[in-house]
Design a protein with these regions (language model features):
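Acidic, contiguous N-terminal accessory segments
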Residues: 2, 22-122, 151-160
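C-terminal segment of classical bacterial N-terminal signal peptides
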Residues: 14-20
Length: 845
C-alpha cells in the first residue's frame, strides 16, 4: 500500500499520456503542517544499545575480559550461528543461553514473545529468553555492548531485563516503484534481526504474482527460489516472513476462486511461508465488498490457518484503511469487520489520512469500529509520491503513551531505496520496542553512527538537509541552519551559513572516501552529486552577496550569471532534490533579490518580477516560481485540497496599469483535474478590497483577459467559487502584461521574436538565447544602453549602431557580460550580432 495518495505521481504520468482523467480529490489530503522534532541528543558515554532497553544497568568498574574468548553453553542448540561475533574458547568466560516459559518466569522475564534477561557478573554471562526469539534478542544486546566504544573488548557487569511493547514490529514492502533487489532484501532482513524487528510483510506492488491478474498463478522457479531464500533469512533472524496477496481487483466470490486462493497459499506454504496477509487496498468494484471479504477471511482462518497448525493468525488490509474515506457508520466496512471478522485476524490502519502521525485519537476511532487493537501501517519513509526525495530525516510523529491495548503492531512502509531506508527503520524499531522512552532526535543521531560509523559527520550533513517531501507528509529539515534575506543579516549569521555550505560542498567526497556501505552509496550517489552542487552554488551566492553589497557591478553580474542554474542543472536537481526547505530557497531568494535590487539600482524602477501569493502555504515558497518561469511545461501545485474561497495570485511588486492577464490552470489543458473549475479573476490595490475582472469562469483551463481600459492594481488573483472539486490546484503560467512586440514603443527584429521579448520585459531573471542578429529601434531621448548578458567562454558579441538608412556608424566588440553602450549621433538602430544569452537591454535617458 503506499496508498492512493502515493499513486498520484504515477497518475500524473498517465494523464500526460492521454489516459482518462481520474478525480484524486480524496487521495491527497495530508496537512502541510511541519512540526519540530521531539527529544534531544544524549551522551551515552560510549554505550549504545538499540532498541532502547526497558531496564539496563551497567557497572563499568567491574568487567569480564573477553579477549581470550568465551565458552558458549547453548542449552537448546539454537544459536551456533548467532555467537560468531565472539571468540570461542573452551576455557573462556562462560556464556549460557537458554529459553522457556518456566525458566523465564524464574529469571523475572516478562511473559511476552521476545522478552529476555541478560546478566554479566563474576559467574559469567547468562541470557534467558521467554522464547527462542527472546534469547536471540539477548544476544543482539550482548553484541552491541561488547562492540561498544565503552567496552573495548570487555564485558562490564550488566543487568538487563527487556521486552518489546508491541508484539508485531517491522516493515511492509508495499510501495510503488522499482522493487528492492534480492541482495537489498537480504541485507534488510539481517538489519531487522539486529534491531529486534520481527515482521517483514512481503507485498511489492510490482510483483505480478502478488496481485491482479497473476495472483492465482505459481511463481516461476527463479522467483520461488528467491522467496524461499528470504524465508530462510527471516528464520535466521527470527523474523516472520509474511507473504501478502492482493486478489481484490478481480476476485470472484465463488468456490473456484476460493480454491485458487487456497492453492496459492499452499504453494507459498511449501516454500516455507508460515505467515500470510490478505490485502484489499486500492481496489474498487465487487472485490471491495466487506461482507464477502469477512466471509473469505473467516473461512481461511478456519480451514487453512487452524488446519495447518503452524501458521500465524492472518493479517488483512481493508479497502477503508484510512479515516479520510472510511465510512464511519454502523453499516461501514470497519464496523462490519468489528461485528463479523474472526477476532484472531489483525486489521491494518494508516491513520486519519494516508500518510499521517500515529495518535491515540486515530486509534480510538478505528478500534471502536473494528473491536480490536489496530495494526498500524505507517507510510514513512516511503517516497513514491515524491520520488525526487530520499528521506533521511528523523523518525517522529509517533505518540509515546500508547500500549499494546491501543495497537497490536507497527510496521513501516519504506522507500524503494532499501539501504537508505535503514535510518528511518532504526527509529521504527526503537519506537515499537520501547514506546514511552522513544527519543526521536537522539535515535536519529545514533542511527547515523550505526549506519556509517566511519563517515557519520558527512552523512549527518546530508541527512539533515534531506528530510522533507515538499508536499503531502511534511517533515522538518535543516533545523540547525538559519538563513536570511540579503538585506537583513549579521556577520555571525553570514559566517555560520557560509560554513554550512562548505560542509555541504565537501560531504559527497567525504562519503565517497569513507563510507564502507557500498549498497547505501549506490542509492545515495545521485542525491549526493546534486547535494555537492548545491553547496557549491551556495558558496558562490555568499561571495556574490559581498560583491553586491560592495557595489562592484561588473564582478557582481559576472558572478550572478555564472551562478545561475541552467535548464540542465534544474532538471538534474529536480530529479534528486535535497535542501528544499532552507538551502535551495536561500540560493533562489538571494539570487532573485540581488537581481531585482541590481535592476532597480540601474533603472530606478521596480522590476517586473512577480511573486506568488494566496491561501496555500506553498505559495510563500520558491515552488510558486513555476508560475512565472515562462515555461508552460512546469507548474506550481498547491499541496492541499482546494476549498471554496481559496485563491492563487501574483504580487506585481508595485502598483501597475494592468491591461492583460493570461493564466494556464492545471498540469495540462486537456484532462487534468487539478484546477479551479469555477473561478473568477480579480484585482486589488491593497490585498484587502478585491474587484472582479470577469464573471464566473467554469471549466476553463486557459484564462485570457484583455482590455483597452487598464486598471490600476498591485495584486491579481483567481479565486475559487462554489464547486464540489477538492483536488489540489495547479497553475502553469500566470502572466500579467506579457511583453509583446505590440507593447514595445520601438521595433524589434530577431530570429525568434517572441523569445527576444524577454530582453525587454524589465525582469532581470528572464533571458533568451540570441543566435544571429537582433535589431532594435532607438527611442527618442535615449543616450545609451546597459546590456546584461552572459557570454560563452571565449565568445563575444558585435554591437553595431546604424543610422536611419542602415549605414554603420559605430562598431563595438563586446567581450564582457556587463556592458554599457554610448550612442553616437544619428544612431537610429542598434544591432547585436552573435551568440549570447541576453537578460535585459536597458535604455539610459
Amino acid at each position: 500500500m503506499t496508498r492512493k495518495v502515493i499513486l498520484a505521481a504515477m497518475l500524473m504520468a498517465a494523464f500526460a499520456q492521454g489516459t482518462q482523467a481520474q478525480d484524486l480529490s480524496g487521495q491527497r489530503s495530508e496537512k502541510q503542517d511541519v512540526h519540530m522534532i521531539p527529544g534531544k541528543k544524549l551522551d551515552h558515554h560510549g554505550l549504545i544499545v538499540s532498541p532502547t532497553p526497558h531496564l539496563l544497568n551497567v557497572d563499568a568498574a567491574n568487567r569480564l575480559d573477553l579477549q581470550k574468548g568465551v565458552k558458549v553453553i547453548d542449552k537448546k542448540g539454537k544459536f551456533a550461528d548467532d555467537v560468531k561475533f565472539l571468540t570461542a574458547n573452551a576455557k573462556g568466560i562462560r556464556l549460557t543461553i537458554d529459553f522457556g516459559e518456566k525458566l523465564a518466569a524464574k529469571a523475572g522475564v516478562k511473559p511476552v514473545s521476545g522478552a529476555y534477561s541478560l546478566k554479566a557478573n563474576a559467574k559469567g554471562i547468562q541470557i534467558v529468553g521467554y522464547d527462542e526469539r527472546g534469547a536471540f534478542y539477548g544476544l543482539q544486546t550482548l553484541r552491541q555492548i561488547v562492540n561498544s566504544e565503552m567496552a573495548k573488548g570487555q564485558m562490564p557487569y550488566t543487568t538487563c531485563n527487556d521486552y518489546p511493547d508491541l508484539p508485531n514490529r517491522g516493515v511492509v514492502e508495499g510501495f510503488y516503484g522499482e522493487p528492492w533487489s534480492h541482495q537489498v532484501r537480504l541485507s534488510l532482513i539481517d538489519y531487522y534481526g539486529k534491531n529486534k524487528m520481527n515482521t517483514y510483510l512481503y507485498g511489492p506492488k510490482d510483483d505480478p504474482y502478488h496481485s491482479c491478474p497473476n495472483w492465482r498463478l505459481p511463481y516461476p522457479e527463479k522467483e520461488a527460489k528467491n522467496i524461499s531464500e528470504l524465508v530462510q533469512a527471516c528464520r535466521r533472524n527470527r523474523v516472520d516472513f509474511v507473504w501478502a496477496i492482493h486478489p481484490g481487483q478481480d476476485i470472484k466470490w465463488n468456490e473456484e476462486d476460493y480454491q485458487n486462493l487456497v492453492h496459492k497459499l499452499d504453494l507459498m506454504y511449501d516454500l516455507g511461508v508460515r505467515s500470510f496477509a490478505i490485502f484489499f487496498d486500492d481496489i474498487s468494484g465487487e472485490g471491495a465488498n466487506p461482507v464477502k471479504q469477512s466471509e473469505l477471511l473467516n473461512r481461511l482462518a478456519k480451514e487453512f490457518v487452524k488446519v495447518k497448525g503452524d501458521v500465524t493468525p492472518l493479517v488483512m488490509c481493508p479497502t477503508d484503511y484510512t479515516r479520510l474515506w472510511a465510512n464511519p457508520k454502523p453499516t461501514g466496512s470497519l464496523a462490519i469487520f468489528g461485528n463479523t471478522l474472526d477476532p484472531s485476524i489483525n486489521v491494518f490502519w494508516t491513520g486519519d489520512v494516508v500518510c499521517s502521525d500515529l495518535t491515540r485519537e486515530t486509534l480510538d476511532w478505528v478500534n471502536s469500529r473494528i473491536k480490536r487493537p489496530a495494526y498500524y501501517w505507517w507510510n514513512f519513509p516511503v517516497t513514491d509520491y515524491a520520488r525526487h526525495i530520499i528521506m533521511q530525516g528523523p523518525t517522529y510523529g509517533l505518540q509515546t503513551d500508547l500500549t499494546n491495548k491501543d495497537l497490536c503492531g507497527f510496521v513501516s512502509n519504506p522507500m524503494e531505496h532499501g539501504e537508505a531506508s535503514k535510518l528511518a527503520l532504526y527509529g521504527v524499531a526503537d519506537y515499537a520496542w520501547n514506546i514511552a522512552n522513544y527519543n526521536p532526535l537522539d535515535n536519529w543521531e545514533r542511527g547515523l553512527v550505526d549506519l556509517t560509523p566511519e563517515a557519520h559527520d558527512a552523512y549527518r550533513t546530508f541527512a539533515m538537509h534531506s528530510c522533507d517531501t515538499e508536499t503531502g507528509y511534511r517533515r522538518i529539515e535543516s533545523w540547525e541552519t538559519k538563513s536570511f534575506r540579503i538585506d537583513n543579516f549579521t556577520d555571525a549569521e553570514f559566517n555560520a551559513l557560509q560554513k554550512e555550505f562548505e560542509k555541504v560542498k565537501n560531504a559527497p567526497a567525504q562519503m565517497e572516501a569513507n563510507c564502507k556501505n557500498a549498497l547505501l552509496m549506490k542509492e545515495l550517489r545521485p542525491w549526493l552529486t546534486e547535494f555537492g552542487k548545491l553547496g557549491n552554488r551556495g558558496l558562490k551566492t555568499m561571495q556574490l552577496i559581498k560583491e553586491y553589497k560592495a557595489g562592484n557591478d561588473q564582478a557582481f553580474w559576472d558572478g550572478y550569471v555564472n551562478n545561475r542554474m541552467s535548464k540542465e542543472d534544474v532538471a538534474a536537481y529536480e530529479k534528486h532534490k535535497s535542501g528544499t526547505m532552507v538551502l535551495q530557497p536561500f540560493y533562489e531568494q538571494s539570487m532573485d533579490d540581488m537581481a531585482s535590487g541590481f535592476f532597480k539600482k540601474l533603472t530606478g524602477k521596480v522590476p517586473a518580477f512577480y511573486k506568488g501569493i494566496g491561501t496555500y502555504a506553498t505559495l510563500r515558497t520558491t515552488q510558486s516560481k513555476a508560475m512565472f518561469d515562462n515555461d508552460s511545461t512546469t507548474y506550481y501545485t498547491s499541496g492541499n485540497g482546494q476549498n471554496t474561497g481559496d485563491w492563487i495570485g501574483a504580487d506585481l511588486g508595485c502598483v501597475r496599469s494592468v491591461s492583460e492577464v493570461r493564466i494556464l490552470q492545471g498540469r495540462n489543458s486537456v484532462d487534468d483535474v487539478d484546477y479551479f473549475d469555477n473561478t473568477v479573476l480579480e484585482y486589488s490595490l491593497d490585498k484587502k478590497e478585491w474587484k472582479a475582472l470577469t464573471g464566473e469562469l467554469k471549466k476553463q483551463y486557459i484564462i485570457n483577459w484583455k482590455t483597452d481600459s487598464p486598471v490600476e492594481a498591485r495584486y491579481i488573483r483567481i479565486r475559487k467559487l462554489k464547486s464540489d472539486k477538492r483536488n489540489w490546484a495547479a497553475v502553469r503560467t500566470f502572466e500579467v502584461n506579457p511583453t509583446t512586440p505590440e507593447r514595445l514603443s520601438f521595433p524589434v527584429e530577431a530570429g525568434n521574436l517572441q523569445a527576444a521579448m524577454y530582453g525587454f520585459d524589465e525582469n532581470p531573471c528572464t533571458s533568451f538565447i540570441n543566435e544571429g542578429t537582433l535589431t532594435m529601434g532607438v527611442e527618442k531621448d535615449v543616450k545609451g544602453y546597459t546590456l546584461l548578458l552572459k557570454l560563452a567562454p571565449g565568445k563575444s558579441l558585435v554591437c553595431r549602431q546604424l543610422n536611419a538608412k542602415g549605414k554603420v556608424l559605430a562598431t563595438t566588440n563586446i567581450d564582457q557580460s556587463f556592458c554599457k553602450i554610448e550612442l553616437v549621433k544619428k544612431a537610429a538602430k542598434l544591432q547585436l550580432d552573435g551568440s549570447a544569452e541576453i537578460f535585459e537591454i536597458i535604455p539610459e535617458k
